[in-house]
């Protein structure tokens, strides 16, 4: 995977590792074979180094995240612009609106890039239970577009894989959540 760069994108703090989704993302990131960088929105800690770029937001509110998307997109663009092969991994453990805006924008900049959408759940089903009808319908529409137009879409279980096929007529790759355990148990 020489000359390949991968941008991992999260809309929540993945570093430092502070919740289940961040543990899964960190495990995936650490085991990814090519040159890579994690781009995250975070209200916890601003971490900027060789492997991580944080767009810091004061409070974890949807409007703050929406207003931070242009800066996130610009950061990813600057990282990938000189790379021959570009892979963009969008971690879908946040509202699909953020994922869709980033997907659409980066696809305009990098037509030949490969974009992978890592679905952590069927979000429209969650929004149907816990959000108003407008947010539910918008989520379902954007989720349909994401599954249809990304280069690779994943699902975390056989149940969700079949449900996505039924809802959106899209075949996903089964990619269960996993973590890497890097410590040894003492005897």
Tell me what each language-model feature is:
Residues 147-171:
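A short, active-site helix/loop in glycosyltransferases that binds the activated sugar's phosphate group
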Residues 76-99, 112-116:
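Short N-terminal targeting/anchoring amphipathic segment
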Residues 47-75, 129-135:
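A short, charged, and often flexible helix/loop element on the N-terminal side
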Residues 77, 104, 108, 123, ...:
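Membrane-proximal helix-turn-helix segments that form the acceptor-binding/catalytic region
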Residues 119-131:
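A short, histidine- and acid-enriched strand-loop-helix "catalytic/donor-clamping" loop
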Residues 159, 177-178:
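Carbohydrate-associated surface elements
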């Amino acid at each position: 995977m020489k000359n390949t760069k991968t941008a991992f994108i999260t809309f929540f703090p993945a570093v430092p590792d502070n919740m289940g989704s961040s543990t899964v993302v960190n495990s995936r990131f650490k085991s990814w074979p090519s040159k890579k960088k994690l781009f995250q929105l975070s209200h916890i800690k601003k971490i900027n180094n060789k492997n991580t770029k944080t767009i810091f937001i004061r409070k974890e509110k949807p409007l703050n995240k929406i207003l931070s998307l242009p800066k996130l997109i610009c950061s990813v663009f600057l990282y990938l612009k000189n790379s021959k092969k570009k892979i963009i991994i969008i971690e879908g453990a946040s509202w699909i609106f953020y994922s869709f805006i980033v997907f659409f924008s980066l696809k305009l900049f990098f037509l030949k890039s490969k974009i992978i959408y890592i679905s952590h759940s069927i979000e429209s089903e969650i929004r149907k239970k816990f959000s108003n009808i407008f947010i539910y319908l918008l989520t379902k529409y954007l989720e349909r577009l994401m599954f249809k137009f990304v280069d690779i879409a994943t699902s975390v279980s056989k149940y969700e894989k079949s449900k996505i096929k039924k809802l959106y007529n899209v075949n996903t790759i089964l990619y269960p959540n996993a973590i890497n355990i890097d410590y040894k148990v003492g005897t």
